[in-house]
Regions:
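Acidic/histidine-enriched alpha-helical segments
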Residues: 59, 115-139, 227-233, 333-358
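Short, flexible, solvent-exposed loop/turn segments with mixed acidic/basic and small polar residues
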Residues: 75-76, 84, 183-191, 299-303, ...
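Short amphipathic beta-strand starts and helix->beta connectors
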Residues: 66-71, 174-186, 237, 291-298, ...
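Short, low-order "capping/linker" segments at domain edges
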Residues: 137-141, 238-250, 352-362
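Compact, aliphatic and Gly/Pro-tolerant "microcore" segments centered on a short helix or tight beta-hairpin
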Residues: 124-189
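His/Glu-rich zincin catalytic helix
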Residues: 1-66, 171-174, 184-287, 324, ...
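M16 family metallopeptidases and their MPP-like homologs
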Residues: 18-30, 36-38, 55-111, 148-170, ...
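Short, polar/flexible loop-turn hinges at active-site or ligand-entry regions and domain interfaces
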Residues: 48-51, 93-96, 115-124
């Protein structure tokens, strides 16, 4: 439902949970220059505001609302970057008063958005500096993790788009360059220029919600967003080797595929990836790790919104070429149809089970609705989605596998 140009509210009625959930999402274009600013905004939104200017008073106010929880997160989809504020609170039936919490919770959200902890067009320095340091520490700790580091470096190598080279929370050097002024100005831009989607998950009075949201100064905005990205195939594989002090080496491979969300072969791609390396029954795991002992860990994953499929393997440095040949061999076997019907059927069962389990999470419902709004008929109901998975044949999997092509190879070489 449109509130203004570029501003929408989405009702997701459900009695599945004891809580109601409000998700306020701001989505802008993915840009290397703004990722760190937006990550800092998400930190500040979950820390304090003018009405509750300390971390302690902020938490106490949430506690007074019968333990209402506030969290923020950032995410990317194609060439877009989103910042979410999520408020979760008890439904009226569980509150020992007749008034309920809706108005107070939405009022608190409004304070976070329109009364941020600021002075003279910038965030209050003391709290901002703490949150900036917290984010930098978080990023530094992540970078010390060899698997995370290899993933980041693998994507830097694979992508040509500068925004996609940067993790969704930014990089420490990008965060370091931001100030209380630059982050605050970005926040003001987000409020007035980003696409805004407000998700109401649970039991809500639609009229009451619309009445409340019209009190927010949400003006119309025009924004052109690209939720899908497709990188052209090149016939030269980019390679990089980087030594790092570690007892283990990591092989990070980037493959390109030509499919987008909702395409006919999207479902075959899901099945292929699950069979190739996503789960513990996959050919990479059972063959390279369990049977041949070439990898401590190995897995694959793909992002339908950027056209990237990744394989990582934690290995001994001396096993690099052997592991590379093993991964290529297993991919070729799938291309040639050298896998059993029982493996295909087992894969479908696991995908089905995981999809049904994910329905228990409110965020899954939010993403399903968002995809429906963005992609229209390409986004299917769970029932239809499962039907499409079930229709995938061996021939479909082989066809998709033949379109998965290696584009980058990053090797984190462990040295003592």
């Amino acid at each position: 439902m449109k509130i203004a140009d570029g501003v929408y509210v989405h009702f997701i009625p459900t009695q599945k949970y004891k809580t109601n959930r409000i998700v306020f999402r701001m989505t802008g274009s993915l840009n290397k220059q703004t990722i760190a600013k937006r990550a800092l905004v998400s930190q500040m939104l979950a820390t304090a505001n003018q009405m509750y200017p300390t971390v302690q008073s902020f938490k106490e106010r949430l506690a007074s609302l019968y333990g209402t929880q506030l969290s923020t997160r950032v995410s990317t989809k194609g060439l877009t970057h989103s910042v979410d504020i999520e408020l979760t609170y008890l439904k009226d039936a569980l509150i020992p008063t007749n008034e309920g919490l809706f108005w107070e919770v939405l009022g608190f959200l409004k304070e976070c958005l329109y009364k941020p902890l600021s002075r003279v067009a910038q965030y209050q320095n003391k709290v901002f500096d703490i949150e900036k340091q917290n984010l930098m520490t978080y990023l530094d700790v992540d970078t010390e993790n060899n698997y995370y580091y290899s993933e980041v470096k693998g994507r830097e190598l694979y992508f040509v788009n500068e925004g996609l080279k940067v993790p969704k929370y930014g990089q420490a050097e990008l965060v370091e360059a931001e100030t209380s002024f630059t982050a605050y100005q970005e926040f003001q831009s987000m409020l007035t220029r980003d696409r805004i989607d407000i998700f109401m998950v649970g039991e809500f009075d639609d009229y009451q919600v619309l009445q409340a949201l019209h009190r927010f100064p949400l003006e119309g905005r025009q924004i052109d967003l690209q939720f899908s990205y497709s990188q052209p195939y090149v016939n030269v594989v980019k390679e990089k080797i980087e030594p790092r002090q570690s007892s283990q080496s990591i092989l990070q491979l980037g493959y390109q595929f030509p499919y987008q969300y909702g395409d006919k072969d999207y479902f075959a791609l899901i099945v292929f990836n699950a069979m190739f390396g996503e789960f513990a029954h996959s050919v990479l795991f059972t063959t390279l790790r369990e049977k041949e002992g070439l990898a401590y860990s190995i897995s694959s994953q793909f992002d339908i919104f950027t056209g990237l499929l990744e394989v990582y393997a934690g290995i001994e440095k001396s096993n690099r070429n052997q592991a590379m040949r093993g991964i290529s061999r297993e991919l070729n076997y799938i291309k040639l149809g050298r896998f059993s019907s029982s493996l295909l059927n087992q894969t479908k069962k696991i995908i089905r089970m995981n999809a049904l389990l994910s329905e228990d999470h409110a965020l899954t419902l939010v993403e399903q609705r968002f995809n429906k709004v963005i992609f229209g008929d390409k986004s299917l109901s769970l029932e239809n989605w499962l039907d499409e998975i079930e229709k995938v044949t061996k021939k479909d999997v082989c066809r998709v596998a033949r379109q998965v092509k290696l584009q980058s190879l990053f090797f984190l070489e462990g040295v003592s």
